[in-house]
């Protein structure tokens, strides 16, 4: 399947820096628009909202991104947008042959449960921690502390003197995530270079963390969080 998400760019006078949406998470808010299946020949045909910056991530069977698209595309109303693949020359054209997807009607995106919304730690990830982790990671029995509603001031920078309010649980969890920074070198990533399984968080859970069995849907939420650069 493909995960389709959109960038919600910052408005004038809105906070705009590497830490605006999370620690080194990027400049902009991201909204998951939905997923769409991929045909056996690798083709896909689907509709997207017009005049919206769109990014695409191919997913594995568990719902984790195999590759990251570090750019975006937009479509005008009624426009047909096509691409030849993540690793192909941008000046090349598709092979002139019929694909499985082209013989079918364009699919509508399967929107996430609860609808399209900004993907935030407090709304998406904290409930996963509440259900699976906080019974032990409660500031008393085990560290780190993953309880909610504990706001702290995060200070960064010698020249900029940035002070921001973050959830303590976010500050405690994000170091366990392996992801690219907001201004990484511009090169084509190797497939699975930043796969969620490379993050210590996922490795701990998959290895069996004190008998905790995180439900599949909650794991998919963690995968999405990692794939969006841990906002």
Description of each model-found segment:
Residues 16-19, 27-30, 55, 108:
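N-terminal start-of-chain detector that recognizes signal peptides
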Residues 6-10, 26-28, 44, 54, ...:
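Short, structured secondary-structure elements
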Residues 49-53, 57-72, 76-231:
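Aromatic- and Gly/Pro-enriched helix-to-coil junctions and flexible linker segments
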Residues 1-25:
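Extended low-complexity, serine/threonine- and proline-enriched intrinsically disordered segments
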Residues 21-41:
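Short, acidic Ser/Thr/Gly-rich low-complexity loop/linker segments typical of extracellular
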């Amino acid at each position: 399947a493909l995960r389709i998400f959109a960038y919600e760019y910052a408005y004038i006078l809105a906070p705009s820096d590497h830490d605006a949406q999370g620690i080194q998470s990027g400049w902009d808010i991201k909204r998951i628009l939905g997923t769409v299946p991929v045909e056996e020949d690798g083709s896909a045909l689907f509709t997207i909202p017009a005049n919206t910056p769109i990014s695409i991530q191919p997913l594995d069977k568990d719902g984790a991104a195999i590759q990251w698209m570090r750019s975006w595309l937009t479509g005008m109303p009624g426009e047909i947008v096509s691409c030849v693949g993540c690793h192909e020359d941008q000046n090349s054209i598709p092979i002139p042959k019929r694909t499985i997807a082209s013989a079918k009607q364009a699919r509508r995106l399967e929107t996430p449960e609860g609808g399209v919304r900004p993907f935030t730690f407090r709304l998406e990830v904290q409930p996963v921690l509440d259900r699976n982790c906080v019974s032990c990671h409660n500031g008393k029995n085990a560290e780190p502390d993953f309880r909610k509603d504990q706001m702290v001031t995060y200070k960064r920078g010698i020249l900029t003197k940035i002070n921001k309010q973050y959830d303590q649980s976010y500050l405690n969890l994000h170091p366990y995530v392996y992801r690219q920074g907001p201004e990484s070198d511009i090169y084509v990533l190797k497939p699975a270079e930043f796969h969620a399984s490379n993050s210590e968080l996922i490795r701990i859970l998959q290895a069996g963390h004190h008998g905790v069995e995180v439900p599949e849907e909650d794991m998919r939420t963690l995968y999405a969080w990692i794939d969006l650069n841990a906002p």
